[in-house]
Amino acid sequence: MAKQDYYEILGVSKTAEEREIRKAYKRLAMKYHPDRNQGDKEAEAKFKEIKEAYEVLTDSQKRAAYDQYGHAAFEQGGMGGGGFGGGADFSDIFGDVFGDIFGGGRGRQRAARGADLRYNMELTLEEAVRGVTKEIRIPTLEECDVCHGSGAKPGTQPQTCPTCHGSGQVQMRQGFFAVQQTCPHCQGRGTLIKDPCNKCHGHGRVERSKTLSVKIPAGVDTGDRIRLAGEGEAGEHGAPAGDLYVQVQVKQHPIFEREGNNLYCEVPINFAMAALGGEIEVPTLDGRVKLKVPGETQTGKLFRMRGKGVKSVRGGAQGDLLCRVVVETPVGLNERQKQLLQELQESFGGPTGEHNSPRSKSFFDGVKKFFDDLTR
């Protein structure tokens, strides 16, 4: 039986941040935990699925592999043979929520994961439709290459905090209650840096700009977001790096407008072509193509050219190009042209176009009836 999608198991979107994933996990883990559903095999199986999904989606490397290859990334021993097994104690799930209140915390605070970054990328319509690889340069915090993220001077090590003795927490008595709090001396890390690194001054990270090559898939549109796992800021003291999100913005095109997978454009034609019909050239993203215009074409008519639109990045059929005809009124007429048009108008039966312009005749008949009704 096919395995369920990890994001669906936790009820989060594919772009969910780590804190959203942790929140969803805690809610579901409390509901299906074996200690609360003793003897319920379905709840036990559901809990294992939840824990497996959580362990993948909170590990940046595993999540990146899963996003690219799905469950196949962990088949044939890819997870080291049962890397998700085992139960979980309630204190593991909820200790960091209730620890400060009841003194049952999980001890030393983990080093903070690096912050996620966002980069706004403008693309031309052609680049968005066909795909492109672009180089970007971003300011970020990277792991210090001297101390390798420890913050300590090479040859030295962080020292155990003398206040909390390495636990990251201290106990404060308030009347009959003992409350555990984050150690104010080491900020919960359990260690102190006595001899800080000269380059990063004990932070373990340095400010730097880096250049990345970003592959934009064909078919993206404004609002789409591309995730580059591990390309955000470096984590504190060796913690995992954050992610980089590239936000796509497609620039306005001088000819085409995009709606979903379809492209739209306006094609001007003269009134003679509209009346008599003929063949014109229209632009597409792949070059010019011929379009046959039938006689008696009215302005605003849409002509659909199938398969000349956009193929969505999410798959599916290629969109179409819809050409909207605009019949232009001639300008800059010479005397001969004016005379011919005057003769043509007379042949139509006057301005109302009784013989050849049914819409005009219908309109003027309606106007006449309106005023006749007013004078009765």
From Swiss-Prot:
This is Chaperone protein DnaJ. Induction: By heat shock under the control of the HtpR regulatory protein. The keyword Ribosomal protein does not apply. A zinc finger (CR-type) spans 131-209. It is found in: Cytoplasm. One of its GO terms (molecular function) is protein-folding chaperone binding. CXXCXGXG motif repeats lie at residues 144-151, 161-168, 183-190, 197-204. The gene is dnaJ. Disruption phenotype: Single dnaJ and double dnaK-dnaJ disruption are non-essential; synthetic lethality is seen in a triple tig-dnaK-dnaJ disruption, although this depends on temperature (triple disruptions grow slowly at 20 and 34 degrees Celsius but not at 43 degrees) and strain background. Changing C183S: Loss of function. Its cofactor is Zn(2+). CDD domains: DnaJ, DnaJ_C, DnaJ_zf. Residues 3-72 form the J domain. Changing C144S: Loss of DnaK-independent chaperone activity.
